[in-house]
Swiss-Prot record:
Pathway: Nucleotide-sugar biosynthesis; UDP-N-acetyl-alpha-D-glucosamine biosynthesis; N-acetyl-alpha-D-glucosamine 1-phosphate from alpha-D-glucosamine 6-phosphate (route II): step 2/2; Nucleotide-sugar biosynthesis; UDP-N-acetyl-alpha-D-glucosamine biosynthesis; UDP-N-acetyl-alpha-D-glucosamine from N-acetyl-alpha-D-glucosamine 1-phosphate: step 1/1; Bacterial outer membrane biogenesis; LPS lipid A biosynthesis. It comes from Blochmanniella floridana. This is Bifunctional protein GlmU. GO terms for molecular function: glucosamine-1-phosphate N-acetyltransferase activity; magnesium ion binding; UDP-N-acetylglucosamine diphosphorylase activity. Binds 1 Mg(2+) ion per subunit. It is an enzyme of class 2 (transferase). GO terms for cellular component: cytoplasm; membrane. Acetyl-CoA binds at residues 388, 394-395, 431, 448. Residues 259-465 are annotated as: N-acetyltransferase. In the N-terminal section; belongs to the N-acetylglucosamine-1-phosphate uridyltransferase family. The active site is at 371 (proton acceptor). Catalyzes the last two sequential reactions in the de novo biosynthetic pathway for UDP-N-acetylglucosamine (UDP-GlcNAc). The C-terminal domain catalyzes the transfer of acetyl group from acetyl coenzyme A to glucosamine-1-phosphate (GlcN-1-P) to produce N-acetylglucosamine-1-phosphate (GlcNAc-1-P), which is converted into UDP-GlcNAc by the transfer of uridine 5-monophosphate (from uridine 5-triphosphate), a reaction catalyzed by the N-terminal domain. Gene3D superfamilies: Hexapeptide repeat proteins, Spore Coat Polysaccharide Biosynthesis Protein SpsA, Chain A. One of its GO terms (biological process) is cell morphogenesis.
Amino acid sequence: MLRKKYSVIILAAGQGKRMLSSIPKVMHKIAGRSMLQHLIDSVSKINIQSIYIVYNESLREFIPTIYSNKCTISIYWVLQESVRGTGYAVQQVLSMIHDDNEDILILYGDVPLISDKTLNNLCLMKSKCDIGLLTAYVKNPQGYGRIIRNQYGDVVSIIEDIDIVNQNDRIIKEIHSGIFISVSGYLKSWLNYLIENNLWCNELYLTAIIDIAYKNNFVINAIHPVDVCEVIGINNKSDLVKAERVYQIKEAQKLLELGVMISDLNRFDLRGKLVCGEDVCIDVNVIIEGCVSLGNRVKIGASCILKDVEIGDDVIIYPFSFIENSKIHCKSKIGPFARLRPGTCLQEQVHIGNFVELKNIKLGNNSKVGHLSYLGDADVGNYVNIGAGTIICNYNGKTKNYTCIEDNVFVGADSQLVAPITIGKNAVIGAGTTVTQNVDKDDVIISRVRQFSIVNDKVDKNKKN
């Protein structure tokens, strides 16, 4: 664990024109979180005290959505005064930092996959040098700044991709991720030198300080990330999609190593936190959002969506089911094509069939809702059977009303239960019944037009009434 506290500068003021979107680039999402949030979550795991985020005006409306999981970390938002390059952006923040001995970790908002392990390694290296760079070897370095080393292997400068004129420099495979660490006093001095000596063109590149530091005998070291994929830079939606898949495959691989059976690493999406018991099986195209807990021997069918769900042991979720903010106890079976909306709680061995929608409801042990039904705002007891096509009419146009169905009730197909209403134990509701009044226990209720037939050979069956 790092003992010294660091401050972090996140450069997030880029225009992101290549994203072709009205949404600021750093607010585009990977695994359900913005790129900026990914960075904040990573740096919050190391020993930092402050985060300075340099942003442009288009990001202002998104500021309330950004947070740190650690209350001890302060986040400062710094509006970029003018688009004059990364050097000026950092200098703007440095004017707010009065301790010239403070170590500053600089990150880029469009490099979101950096891990806390890599950042921790970079910070630890800082004790042995004046500048610590995060570099990587990549197959295709196009678009990245290249690391220039001398014959002894020392880093002497960084040349931006746009400024490369020498073919030998162009084929260099070691790239600068944009991420580095140094001391605030040094950064101030180097940037002031560049400005005072007019050693810049239209924009002041932060990377220009490396050449100055080397020529003044400062020690520059470089390390590589734990995984080269961490330094993927995102400039357009194609990059975003690639980064998403890289992230998801890594998360799926972690789950496999923990014993979870993921049918296809390329067809699994984790957009939150997943906790699993033993022998859990997850089929293809499953999406996990929010906080999801799966008990032992749970099976999730293809194309299911689970959002903020707690599922007990031996539960089977059949394909194409959507479950959110719900709790399902052990040995229950759900779906296919079931929808469980917020507030649903299923006790043990409950069966929910295809095309059933539940909302704000509790179903007791061994109760069944077979198919084609809607139940909302209700408390259903144990061993209740709800026939196909049953609807709880819980909304009168102004307010939602509550329904109570006690133990061992049988509700026939195509019934309507008009809330507020209570149905007593062991009652039977005949098929096609509309129930508008409370039903006592053991009662049998039928309310429908009696069937009758018309015998008339002269009736033209093809005539329209």
